[in-house]
Amino acid sequence: MVADFFKKEHGFTMIELTAVLILAGIIAAAAASVLSRQHANLRGRAGALESHIRYARALAMSTDEDNWGIRFDIESDQYWLFYCQTGQTCGWDDNKTRIPGTKQKTVDLKEYKLGISSTSHGGNTVTLAFDNFGTPYWAEADEVLENRLEKSFTATLSDNSANTRDIKVIPETGAVP
C-alpha cells in the first residue's frame, strides 16, 4: 500500500493548469472591461468639452465677433458656446450658439450622468472667453470680460462614482493641453 502511494503521481496535469489560466484570463478581461466602461463616459465628455473650448478659441481668432467663449453654470451642470462684444456685459441667453455636433444650444451634463464640480475661477457661473488673438479671459456672474487669464483655468467634471477629470486652459496662449 505504501508502495502504491509513491507510484501515483500527485499534482496537476498541463491541461488542468492551462484550463485554469484561460478561465482566470477571461474573468480578468471581463472585470477590466466593466471598470473601463465606467470611466469612458467621463473621459469622452471631458474630451468633448476640451474640443468645445478649442472651437470657441478658433472662432474668436477667425471671425469678426470680439469674443467667443464657453459659459459654465455649475449649479445646473451646463455649459454653452457664446459670442459677445469686448467691454460689454453679455446677454448670455441671447448670444448662445449651438456647438456643432450637439442638438441644443446648451450642453446639459446631467444627461450623461456627469456634473461640473468646480472651476478654478469664480463661483457658480463662470465664463471663459477668447479674444481675436486667442488670449483667454474669464469673468464671474455677469461681469464684463476684462480679466485676462493669469493662471491656468481648470474646470473639473465628475461622475456619480466621485471620479473626476480636469480640463485645463493655459494662460497667454489659451491652449488646451
Predicted region positions:
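N-terminal single-pass transmembrane signal-anchor helix
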Residues: 2-35
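Short, acidic, Ser/Thr-enriched surface-loop or helix-capping motifs
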Residues: 8, 131, 171
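Polybasic/polar functional segments that serve as interface/processing modules
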Residues: 14-15, 32, 36-44, 50, ...
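Membrane-proximal N-terminal amphipathic helix
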Residues: 40-69
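Type IV pilin-like appendage domain
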Residues: 67-133, 166, 177
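Surface-exposed intrinsically disordered loops and tails
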Residues: 84-99, 138-156
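Small-residue (G/S/T/A) turn/hinge positions that recur once per unit in extracellular repeat modules
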Residues: 112-114, 119, 134-136, 143, ...
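Low-complexity, S/T/G/P-rich flexible repeat/linker segments used as non-globular hinges
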Residues: 135-137, 154-177
